């Protein structure tokens, strides 16, 4: 019988959203996995430091079958986080959470996406992010740019951006002027971002 990995979270939901602190749905799932007669590997994708609460369960899962913690981290700028990720755990607490899981013997990866045009995609910002990841000795980093699908998603982001940094709204709209169904920006911008990321990876000796 084929065995797979149990995945908690995705690009549109977080298993450790604020309600989890009281409802403990993910905690109960983690405990079930940790004690199951079927030793199944698992991974968690989150931007919340609340995951550290359940480290005893996830460590047991890791010891039995393997566990990966994937943390969303795109910048070290707390002012940016407060504007674009209100209610989310601080970047500093996410870094500390990853450090704790690494010390516990778990694999840890960083989802460095989306890097926001004009906000978190500068060389200096990406370099600082990769340096922080190197300091923790994360196992891998998965970077990616921002997609803005035409319609509600794009309108929501531009509204938030206009409130935070109205000076870069026009340049952001220009990047996405092709209105691709995928939400991808102009290809020249995608290629340029990938080249810069690769250069910075080499600079900080993180050859993922």
Q: Language-model features: where?
A:
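Conserved AdoMet/S-adenosylmethionine-binding subsite of the radical SAM
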Residues: 1-172, 182
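C-terminal accessory regions of radical SAM enzymes
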Residues: 153-155, 160-208
